[in-house]
């Protein structure tokens, strides 16, 4: 990703025009300015960070404000708190549980998903969607952020049809790849897909078919001029046979107050932009204070060597040295004089601390999450602040509830598509996500406490269900097996 944002990928206008001619209204048009703004804050770009000023002589010069990228830090913190390798999908059938978690592990899904969550919490929306390799008969998951996601059909219950736009490369040239995940009631005809040649029996390339309710993945490619391409090996329309969405939309549990009724989400720092500015403003002021307070050394003219330069006898300079050594012209007194300005960092640090507290409070972490530790001088860890931070715990649960539906949706779609390729996967039944809260909770202590309760207020199978994610029948069987083995081992002594 380019540091200046010039090379970042955004949906090209010819792709938007193609979707409009198919009859779709694009909610991206209203949200894109906000998404671009949030993207700039995450990358510390824009007029706040790079601007021009004038000196006393009226000369214009460029100024760059230093940044610790607070907006990105907020998003990364949420990503690390919500998703890691210990997060598991738990199905009603244990074999389905084992299969889907093995799939996620082998495809490194959770690591990539954490990055998706980081971008989604920063830009307001993200997604993961099925990607089918028919040649290898493999199912994979592709990850997208708000720049590449275009909802096509939605209501209060969520997004039911969606398009994803990415850059791909075909024969050494970049192409724009549009993939539409359309519900079974809408059949896409590749012959009439071109908006320039509509067919009378199709409504702009789409035909209602009430008899089918499965999802189809429609792929269209364009060159940089907007001309449609037909790359070898790309199937224009693929019926997944899946009756539920073949994608999952990732959004933070934050109400979108920027565009009313939009299917897009809102950035977690959308209402904290002033706090982001305050953090970087105080950080830059702190660095400037230290830089301007460096010791200055003034040396008498007699300490400098001289050399002949034509008809002139010039002083040999020491070098720039960041403007810390100065020459006193025509001076022989006090050959070496030091000047050390007093540091005012205590006030700067206090302002920086207040800005961090405000940022944490406005982004859902609570006022103490980014607070600075007096003994160590930097921010505390999540575990240190979570014990007395009810705001953080409440918001974690809200975001987990929002994220669970997206993970379950893509997990079910993966299992359904894999069955069509011959994978023996039982029906998953009721499915939920077991999140890992060990980062913010003392999980070891909780497990130990539950272990003490086994045989008193909790059965061994209940312990296994909670801590090993096993379905009830498996947990009961394994608990009984372990108990029998213990009895047999004891009787043999």
Predicted ranges, named:
Residues 100, 114, 356, 411, ...:
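Generic structural marker for isolated residues within well-ordered, non-membrane alpha-helices
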Residues 115, 120-123, 127-266:
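Extended, regular secondary-structure scaffolds
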Residues 364-379, 409-431:
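Short acidic alpha-helical/loop segments enriched in Asp/Glu that coordinate divalent cations
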Residues 478-493:
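Extended, compositionally biased alpha-helical segments that mediate assembly or anchoring
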